[in-house]
Design a protein with these regions (language model features):
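Extended amphipathic alpha-helical segments with heptad-repeat/coiled-coil character used for oligomerization
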Residues: 160-252
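Residue-level signature for tetratricopeptide repeat
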Residues: 118, 147-152, 184-185, 379, ...
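Generic helix N-cap/helix-start motif at coil->alpha-helix transitions
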Residues: 73, 105-113, 137-146, 171-180, ...
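Structural motif corresponding to the intra-repeat A-B loop/turn of tetratricopeptide repeats
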Residues: 122, 155-156, 188, 383, ...
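Bacterial N-terminal signal peptides
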Residues: 11-21
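Solenoid-like repeat scaffolds
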Residues: 59-68, 82-83, 98-105, 132-140, ...
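Long, internal scaffold/assembly segments composed of regular secondary structure
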Residues: 214-390
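Compositionally biased, proline/threonine/alanine/serine-rich low-complexity intrinsically disordered stretches
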Residues: 25-51, 539-593
Length: 593
């Protein structure tokens, strides 16, 4: 059973904060989603599971999504899921599961509240606060109140957040409540009270780096000292609020630790790091491709260049005088900067985000060679842009896996794509195990084709295995036909894994489970994502500069804590005469947009 708040004044404060009329909690103060999507009477009939909120650019799942779910299984998933997900189709699916209301499963109120607390961490931030704002006024769980307050801190709604914190009179929340009180005092410039609250936070005997960071930050705020020796932290609302108070913004290391609702909350913060923040948010499905494109509309434009290549043919002298060699003009290249932007992406997920950003401009690119057109076809496929995919594939010799990926993108049942994949000529990059692995992903996603016997004749490569217990729960959820439970366990099974190294047979089981509970589109997207992730080749990373520990120190001066984050790799002068990548392995000079 859930724990009750001890002080009824706290209940009144919490209720008032949750029932604020129609204002959402957007960072700019503008209204967002209407507060109540479910009327009070209807809410009593369907319970907390009927509450939902809109995620921009996404369709909610059907109202039967929670049907036949096991309460213990989904409760475990709610508690164990983190925002650390590299399979972005599963990130999108998790958002749709958490923010879709439907018929209640057989589960207690505690489990239903776990859904709201997870939604508060996963984001996007506007959807999180809109969902939490619809909780009824009889919810008295301390940890739910803390989740609401932390989400409001992320959304920069300081007064509402601190009203909830100040109203709680409980000792059951441990260190979290003490830290939140310290943050609220600091945000209100009551630094002595903030330092006292930090000193009284319960200790566990282990060093708490967040508590140490907060103590240092509050001391600096109190003294008005420079903040050059304090770095941005943004893993939760408390850290974001203090970082904003100090005027900090994330460096690369801090941004790599920022996920979910916390990351989406800082997309509107103006700083030198905003371009990198927006790219990361786009690659993690926290903003739409359209939102990212609108942000970057003045950054990316289609360049036109006219390469001139000197003739290699020797020219004879005329009357003893040397003659300059003839130059041969080539057709203009349109949009090489678009190609370079994509090819120099720092990671596969960044490449996905950048592909969405340039979707409307991709079709304008012309004049590239065969291998480069094949590379751009991948962006069109991951965007679901059939016309552009066919255009670029028509200007190259498609690689065996690209034909399979295109068929997954188009949907339907392609009886030849799998067969062509299995019959493709062998090469070091197209061994039999690789071909059968990709065919297995396509089979699992619903593509039909001959060749299943190859699974008996081929030893598939073994990659990183998901937890066996999670996979067993997934099989049980599949047998019950629970959409939401299968979606949650699919996310949990691949949490923290790399699409390039995850065990392909296990991923195929997950793809098949999604398909068989009615999530066919999501299954295809996941299979497509994995096939491209395992094949695409981006520019090699730049040479790493030795770290401070690896080289002699010449100065005791520390670098500034806040430095602007580059959007792509370092720029080198463009050389349109340089050889371009081959069809089998794109290689290019490193460029920055």
């Amino acid at each position: 059973m859930i724990k009750k708040l001890r002080n009824q004044i706290g209940l009144i404060t919490l209720s008032l904060a949750l029932l604020l009329p129609a204002h959402g909690f957007s960072q700019d103060g503008n209204p967002i989603t209407p507060r109540a999507a479910v009327a009070k009477q209807a809410l009593r009939e369907v319970g907390l599971w009927g509450i939902g909120a809109q995620v921009e650019g996404q369709e909610p799942l059907p109202s039967d999504l929670w049907q036949d779910a096991d309460g213990e299984s989904i409760g475990l998933a709610f508690r164990k899921i983190t925002p650390d997900q590299k399979f972005m189709p599963l990130q999108t699916l998790l958002q749709r599961v958490l923010f879709s209301g439907g018929t209640a499963p057989v589960a207690d109120e505690f489990t239903s509240l776990e859904r709201f607390k997870l939604a508060a961490r996963i984001g996007p931030i506007n959807s999180s606060v809109a969902l939490l704002a619809q909780l009824p006024d009889n919810i008295t769980d301390t940890y739910t109140a803390l989740a609401i307050a932390d989400t409001l801190l992320m959304a920069n709604r300081i007064d509402e957040a601190c009203a909830i914190i100040n109203g709680l009179q409980t000792t059951n929340a441990g260190a979290t409540l003490g830290k939140m009180r310290a943050v609220c005092y600091a945000l209100n410039n009551e630094f002595s009270a903030a330092q006292l609250a930090i000193d009284t936070v319960p200790q566990t005997g282990q060093v708490d780096p967040v508590l140490q960071w907060m103590a240092k930050a509050i001391a600096n705020l109190s003294a008005g000292a420079p903040v050059s020796n304090i770095v941005f932290r943004g893993e939760d609302g408390m850290q974001i609020a203090i970082s904003r108070k100090l005027g900090l913004y994330p460096n690369r290391e801090a941004l790599d630790r920022t996920y979910g609702a916390a990351l989406s909350a800082i997309t509107g913060d103006i700083s030198l790091a905003r371009a990198a923040v927006m790219l990361r948010a786009s690659s993690m499905s926290l903003i739409t491709a359209q939102q990212y494109s609108e942000f970057a509309k003045d950054v990316v434009h289609v360049e036109v260049t006219t390469p001139v290549v000197s003739s290699s043919q020797a020219m004879p002298p005329v009357n003893g005088a040397l003659v300059e060699p003839l130059s041969e003009s080539k057709p203009p290249v349109v949009g090489r900067n678009i190609y370079d932007l994509l090819y120099n992406a720092r990671s596969f997920n960044d490449w996905v985000g950048l592909s969405g950003r340039v979707k409307s401009q991709l079709r304008q690119v012309e004049g590239l060679n065969s291998a480069e057109n094949g590379f751009l076809a991948n962006s069109a496929i991951i965007n679901g842009d059939t016309a552009s995919a066919l255009h670029f594939l028509g200007q190259t010799d498609p690689l065996p896996w690209q034909d399979l990926a295109r068929s997954l993108m188009e949907g339907g049942e392609n009886n030849l794509a799998i067969q062509r994949r299995l019959e493709a000529a062998a090469s070091p990059k197209n061994t039999r195990p690789i071909a059968v692995s990709e065919a297995l992903l396509a089979w699992s996603a619903g593509l039909r084709g001959r060749g299943l016997s190859e699974l008996l004749n081929t030893n598939l490569p073994i990659g990183t295995m998901p937890p066996a217990g999670t996979m067993a729960l997934l099989d049980m959820a599949l047998a019950r036909g629970s959409k939401a439970e299968v979606g949650l366990l699919a996310y949990l099974a691949l949490q923290g894994m790399d699409p390039k190294t995850a065990d392909v047979a296990s991923v195929s089981r997950i793809v098949s489970a999604l398909s068989h509970v009615g999530l066919e589109k999501e299954a295809r997207e996941l299979a497509l994502y994995v096939i491209i992730a395992r094949n695409i080749e981006l520019a090699p990373p730049p040479r790493q500069i030795p770290s401070r520990e690896q080289r002699p120190s010449t100065s005791t001066t520390r670098p500034p804590a806040n430095t602007a984050l580059p959007l792509a790799r370092p720029q080198v002068p463009s050389n349109n005469n340089a050889p371009r990548p081959s069809a089998s392995a794109p290689q290019s000079q490193t460029k920055k947009p």
